[in-house]
Amino acid sequence: MLIDRRKFLSLTAAAIAAPAFAAEGAAHGQIVTLPKFGPDSVSTSRIRIWLPPDYSEGGSSYRTLFMLDGQYAFAEDSDGVNFAADRRVARLAATGTIEPTLIVAIDNLEEDRFLQYMPQTIYDRTDAGVRAVIEGEINRVGKTALVSAQFIRFLATQLKPYVDTYYRTRPDRLDTAIFGASMAGVMAGSIFVEAQQSFGLGACMSPNWPIYNKQMIDYPELAAVWAAYFAQLGRPEGRRLWLDHGTQMMDAGMAPHQSAIAHRLTDLGWRRGCNLQTRVYDAGHAYAETATQMDEMLAWLLA
């Protein structure tokens, strides 16, 4: 049975509007909007970079955090309903909890968000049951194909090199993070796997592993595909991956998939608390407890 999309969207909107979503403190630093990269759909989204308060004062190089669903990244976005990542990173860096970090916020494709964030590789590797679910979502928006493979390629071969060229970054993968929530959390995991030469720090907040479908929660084929997919990471080699989900709403259905992924990674040498952090929050989907999740995630991932 499909999760009713109108109900899902209303629950998500309510969760986004929760008071816990805002971060305290004034915004600092500078936000720069990048020029458009090209005519294709995956590279025409608005992309902004947040520069830390001291960026213009010296010659230091910075870590970089790439954020999906970028229109909700900063404290002044979406009428205050946002991740407030600029405030959080500035505050955590000021206290020495994390290293100073640039933020690259990439807006989603709105109605085509699912096409952008559902991994093509998972569609290609799974069985007819899972493919039918994915095709149903593609048909719902009146399209014929995913664009996620193109999006990953754009990030790895165009956007990241551009940022590393024109801004003072530390380009090594161990200084480059990718973050997303819900379906963007799924895509953050895919970028971490498929562009692992570029992204060595990853965070998947409430990732929608079951693809909006209740039948996929305990569907062993899908959990096995996710686990095998992440096994492509091999040994950690200094990388870090954060996985979390809640216990309420649709988040409760993410547990089997997160468990399968985590077990496969620990078999490959990923140590919990060191290379791999898995959290379960007594909360609903993605945004409802962002004040807690975001601060804990940033403090661990960017320490």
Language-model segments: which ranges?
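Non-catalytic cap/lid and distal C-terminal segments of serine-dependent acyl enzymes
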Residues: 24-303
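Secretory targeting signals
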Residues: 1-3
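N-terminal export signals
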Residues: 7-24
